[in-house]
Amino acid sequence: SKITMESTTRREYRRLGESLAFIKSLDWNAKTVIDIGAAWGTPELLQAFPNAYHILIDPVPTYEERFKAILDRYNGEYHLCAISASPGKTYLSVPGSGQEVSSQLSISQESENSISVSVETLDSLFVPRPLDWPILVKTDCQGYDLHCFKGGKDFLQRVDIAICEVNMFRPTGRPDLPDFAEIVT
């Protein structure tokens, strides 16, 4: 169904679960969900759209077993790669155990706390293939979200809803991660 300003409230939604419940209340249902920066998976997306085809994307290899477990219960696939404006390779800052917040923004070369990862674009992954519509894309890329979208100029024309999980304010203890104002400027 078509969503118009007349059919929506002007309320701010701060939590992903709240936002998805509102979207569902408008009788909208995703057939394809693309979760960029999926890490451990996004339970709110899985629960809101249990019958959708879920595409989980994260470059950190330690999440692979978790992705396999999720896809034992939900229909979909996973990709162990970063998403950016252009394809190639990059170094990813992975603090501690490799299962914490990682970011492409924090590092540009190899270091003790980095891993080399392949980089794809949304266009290279999804333009050549058919996906069931409607499509929802969620990013949680620790400040790299707009870079993801820059590599999806053609694909994004097929996307119905795009959600960026960003920090409104700089996270305590992570001065390398941007806040909302830095991401959108």
At which residue positions do the language-model features occur?
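Phosphate/nucleotide-binding beta-alpha loop and adjacent structural elements of enzyme active sites
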Residues: K2-T185
